[in-house]
Amino acid sequence: MVAPWRVSVRVCLSHLRCFELRQGLSLLRPSECPRDARLCWLLLGTLPKVVSLCGDVGEGAPDVLSRRRVRCSGAAGAGPAESLPRAGPLGGVFLHLRLWLRAGALLVKFFPLLLLYPLTYLAPSVSTLWLHLLLKATETSGPTYIKLGQWASTRRDLFSEAFCAQFSKLHVRVTPHPWTHTERFLRQAFGDDWGSILSFENREPVGSGCVAQVYKAYANTAFLETDSVQRLGRASCLPPFSHTGAVGGLRELFGYLGNGRKPPENLADQSFLERLLLPKADLVGSNAGVSRAQVPGHQPEATNLISVAVKVLHPGLLAQVHMDLLLMKIGSRVLGVLPGIKWLSLPEIVEEFEKLMVQQIDLRYEAQNLEHFQVNFRNVKAVKFPTPLRPFVTREVLVETYEESVPVSSYQQAGIPVDLKRKIARLGINMLLKMIFVDNFVHADLHPGNILVQGANGLSSSQEAQLQQADICDTLVVAVPSSLCPLRLVLLDAGIVAELQAPDLRNFRAVFMAVVMGQGQRVAELILHHARASECRDVEGFKTEMAMLVTQARKNTITLEKLHVSSLLSSVFKLLMTHKVKLESNFASIVFAIMVLEGLGRSLDPKLDILEAARPFLLTGPVCPP
């Protein structure tokens, strides 16, 4: 279905007058608008018209941008004349100009590095310098290429260990966009009276990444949907009723809520471009906005405020990501003809990365993932996720509870009690194993910056319960107050997740069991049988090397706790790359998550034994279906 778009000539001409030629770089930028918003014009009228003219916005999976070209004349019979897009040539000129300018800038950065690549075989120092230059070029190429570098560093079955080690450092703190853009997004999402919903003490963000930036604010709970209040209560460390005197439940505690939660939308039912470009009013099942009638004209009362984190996408991000993905697809097809890298199937890699970027630039995906994790861990008090506060969830803005906690890296330092370190390490490993083998829903971005620790200061060696008395009118109330929040992990940034199909999950369990049993040849057979692509020309040699690798790793260790799984998996990845065996993307993501968590866990507890911890999960099987 071709999406109808209408933009007047006056709007296009106003965009044309607004832009001037930027000297030196030959880039177009707005003369009156803020510099950081120079890409926003693409969403205002030109890109939707060109897309509707040149490409088919089809129904399908999120990774489908436009699989076939259509002619406007062919769409004439699909509906009445008034539904047809009227796209003039001006939009096409703008889009092609932007594409050529962007392609030229990227070519200037990366083509010299491509020409210098043969020199990396001369000496290791030259290779290190080349990787450093590639890293710097990626850092300055925008959010799409930064995310591509971060994702590539997790695919150790495709890229060298030196490349992955270098690009694992690619965590860039981006200069925050101005407050005016944040205010504009808030107004679009929640109406002109958004100040009645959110209160900001400081307009400076507490963090800024390449995709979004985060503010700390306070939200009025009177506008939360019923289900959000219930999830908020379940996820909170609330004291018993004898402390607060509340007897009416959470509904009275947070205020009466008349409207129930809308049914969650199915993002997979909307095509990629529709989700990115259609106005919020046109989104099927969208809960993107709060009508102005729902928002009172007064400031929120202090008694109804809770601390929240407000994540806001950077302006112009959608247009830039769409443009970069298009250029990546073109580049992957050009580079795919080279014999040395043909086995990588670069177009397929770009499609996998496109799925990841779709999840990153639509914050509704992260909200859904957080709610999914909360359901999976509803009976696990030692793991917590921020609670998305609906209806304050849109494509560009996500409001969630603000979790006061400490980064897990703070507990890697000397002076931290050994028992506390050991507990944190065990919590992390058990959490990951549950995600993999029980839930089949894995947080795929588990670097230390996204893992926080809560309640470490509340641990006490005293087990004695303290009684509390309260004289309420003529009634003596005796209660046992709840202790401080227990030690638990808080996971952030759940925009990227990994799930395995049922056959892949069974294969993963079998591979893990074969590693535990020291059956290296069995590991090789399983990997070859379920590999996404393979140009292995020496199958028997691959099996022999894998058997020697696993056997040698087991021989050098007296007990399983001495076996470093991350080192073993790193060697397995080297072998896969040498024999040109490509893993399925989610399979590789989960293996990499195990490597990261085991490395983090052993930095806290050197005696951590992930294989021993995995035995119950491997023997009992999944509790719930994948």
Swiss-Prot record:
Membrane protein topology class: Single-pass membrane protein
Key word Ribosomal protein present: no
Active site: 445
InterPro entries associated with the record: ABC1_dom (IPR004147), ADCK2_dom (IPR044095), ADCK_kinase (IPR052402), Kinase-like_dom_sf (IPR011009)
Domain Protein kinase: 200-618
Keyword Metal-binding found: no
GO MF term (any one): ATP binding
Chief place where the protein resides: mitochondrion
Compartments, as annotated in UniProt: Mitochondrion; Membrane
Domain of life: Eukaryota
UniProt-annotated binding residues for ATP: 206-214, 311
Class of the enzyme per the UniProt entry, highest EC level: transferase
Pfam families named in the record: ABC1
One GO biological process term: regulation of ubiquinone biosynthetic process
Family: Belongs to the protein kinase superfamily. ADCK protein kinase family.
Annotated PANTHER family: AARF DOMAIN CONTAINING KINASE 2, AARF DOMAIN CONTAINING KINASE 2 (PREDICTED)
Main function: The function of this protein is not yet clear. It is not known if it has protein kinase activity and what type of substrate it would phosphorylate (Ser, Thr or Tyr). Involved in the mitochondrial import of CoQ precursors, plays a role in muscle mitochondrial function and fatty acid beta-oxidation.
Protein name: Uncharacterized aarF domain-containing protein kinase 2
Native organism: Homo sapiens
